[in-house]
Every structure is written in C-alpha cells, then in structure tokens.
Amino acid sequence: ETATMVNAHAQRNGDNEICGYFDTRGRLWGGPDVVRIYFVVQLDKVAEHIDSWADGIYEPGKNTVAASKRSTRREASGWSYEDAPTAGLKVKFDVQPGDQIQLKTSVSFVSVENARLNMSAECSHWDFDAVRKQSQTEWNEWLGRIDVDGGSDNQKIKFYTDLWHTLLGRHKIDDINGEYPDYTQGERQGTHTINAQFKKRQLPLNNCLLYTSPSP
C-alpha cells in the first residue's frame, strides 16, 4: 500500500482504549484520492499516563492528538510517496520486571463503533495462545490448498511466500454488521477518483452470515 497518512485523530477512551481515525491519500494504483480508516486499540492493563505529539510539538499529559492535513508530494513521484508530519500518542504503564502487556487492534472503513464491533465479534478475549493457534490453522488451510511437487526448497519458499503475499493483500472492506464504504461517487481521472464522496452501504444479511466465522 503506497499511501500517506494525514489528518489523524486519536484519543483516550476510558482506562484501556485508544480510538480514532486517519485519512490515507496518494495511492499509486488508483482508487479514491482520500480514504478514511477508523481504529480501536484496547489494552489489558490500565494506562497510567498518555502523552501526545504532532508536527514536532510534544505535549505531556494530553490524551488526544489531531495531526496535520497537509502533505508534500515528492518530486517525480506521480500519485504516490507524499511526506507528512508525524503524530501520535505515547502510552506509559506502571510495570515491574517480567510484566507483560497485551493489546489488540481493529479497523473499519465506516466508523469507530464498527471497529469496536469487529473486535468484539472476532477477538473478545485475551487468550494470546488461542489467537496464535487460530491464525496458524487458518493460514495452513489456505496455503495447504496447493501442493507443489519438484523444484528446489528455495523455489518452494518463494512460491509460498508469493502466495502468502497474494492472500494477505485481499482484505475485506465490509464490517461484521455488513456495513461498507462506497467511494464510487466523484470525478474519474484515469484509475483515480478525485473528490470521492463517502457513502455508507449495507450488505444483505445473508451475505454477512455467510462470511462470518465464529470466534475461537
């Protein structure tokens, strides 16, 4: 994904959650000129202190951050590779040697609420080993659909690595409740859509049930 993140907003929500959104722009492959991605990050330990920074300005004790909307396109870069000021939140914990902190994150192209719903439906627990086992089982099922005979070990490694990359890049854009973003309205310029307008759409319920897998 050759895109630049701008206009990021993040805030603390309660003792153990950070949520917000950011806009992505500058896609080499085309599509909408700006796409917003919402996110939720949950922690299994209370955050004692949060600092923020944006565009080189550090603000201790501030639980929210709003990043710049501006970005600068690099010379001879076409539609991609734009530079933008960085921004973020720094989370501090009261920990002792040997303590572990777990976090999980979920995204949505529609809303923060949907990102939270996705997390609740797909990973409502804190069992790390169960998540790892589920991930291994799912990847083995997908990669095991093709058996390769002959060739060297390096050639097989390259084949399965390329297959993994192919599967990894085919993400869903609809949420657990069937809502998805429609950015098809706007001015077409080649493979790009300029001034794309966001519309929230809804998949039929039967489609949602078909593609929903149970949590471990």
Where are these regions (language model features)?
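Beta-sandwich/jelly-roll carbohydrate-recognition scaffolds of carbohydrate-active enzymes
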Residues: 1-207
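Conserved small/polar residues in nucleotide/adenosyl-binding loops
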Residues: 211-216
